Amino acid sequence: MLLRSLRSWAARSPRSVGPGSSGSPGSLDSGAGPLWAPRRAWPPDKDRENDKEKKAVVCIEGNIASGKTTCLEFFSNTTDVEVLMEPVLKWRNVHGHNPLSLMYHDASRWGLTLQTYVQLTMLDQHTRPQMSPVRLMERSIYSARYIFVENLYRGGKMPEVDYAILSEWFDWIVRNIDVSVDLIVYLRTTPEICYQRLKMRCREEEKVIPMEYLHAIHRLYEEWLVNGSLFPAAAPVLVIEADHNLEKMLELFEQNRARILTPENWKHGP
């Protein structure tokens, strides 16, 4: 199914397509293929439908170890596509300090520190010159705010004043700087599969991540990009079920190549 125009998305209210809504027009099926989750374009005054020369930005979203890097690597050698990986190396080394590791070990103390730097570095990702017609980004400034800052606050790890300041800064960025995106690809993975993959790749900072953390991140992603009950999405959303093994995931990426890389498929209805 092709995406509706961004203008029509702005006019529609988000509708539930999450688990538990079976029988409704937006309910999810149990198949392995992709599904389109209708979203409200936001902010609505950034409709670029008639800007034919605009370069396109696609954000690959998902939980920790959901397969984002694999997806980006799959498309990295495609002509006219550039890839921006999440700037994790920066988060691991700020003048010799590792705020990512500090946050995982003591989120109450270091949550604001890390998320302040994440917001800065993701802003840099969004605003750096784009050289190719299509840019694929690992996550976005939106998920930094709507998923990871939100999780710290809801979990009681971030004081309300820190949350308010980060939120106000984020809102100012969105109002005054072009950080718009054209499509969000959500790699929908169960926390149990993410936990298995996380343990297999054995990254140092991730050794202390509990299953409960992955469940919390998963719930927020579902609220944001599937149910539409958290925050409005920044762009239309393509959901790909991503619990499969590597071979199957590569097949799904190939099957969805045109949907992910072709702007015309994002702007016109079925």
Swiss-Prot record:
Gene3D superfamilies: P-loop containing nucleotide triphosphate hydrolases. GO terms for cellular component: mitochondrial inner membrane; mitochondrion. It is an enzyme of class 2 (transferase). Residues 42-54 have a biased composition (Basic and acidic residues). Residues 1-38 form a transit peptide. Found in most tissues; highly expressed in liver. GO terms for biological process: deoxyribonucleotide metabolic process; DNA biosynthetic process; mitochondrial DNA metabolic process; mitochondrial DNA replication. It catalyses: thymidine + ATP = dTMP + ADP + H(+); 2'-deoxycytidine + ATP = dCMP + ADP + H(+); 2'-deoxyuridine + ATP = dUMP + ADP + H(+). It is found in: Mitochondrion. Its EC number is 2.7.1.21, 2.7.1.74, 2.7.1.-. The active site is at E138. Residues 13-34 have a biased composition (Low complexity). Belongs to the DCK/DGK family. Homodimer. This is Thymidine kinase 2, mitochondrial. It comes from Mus musculus (Mouse).
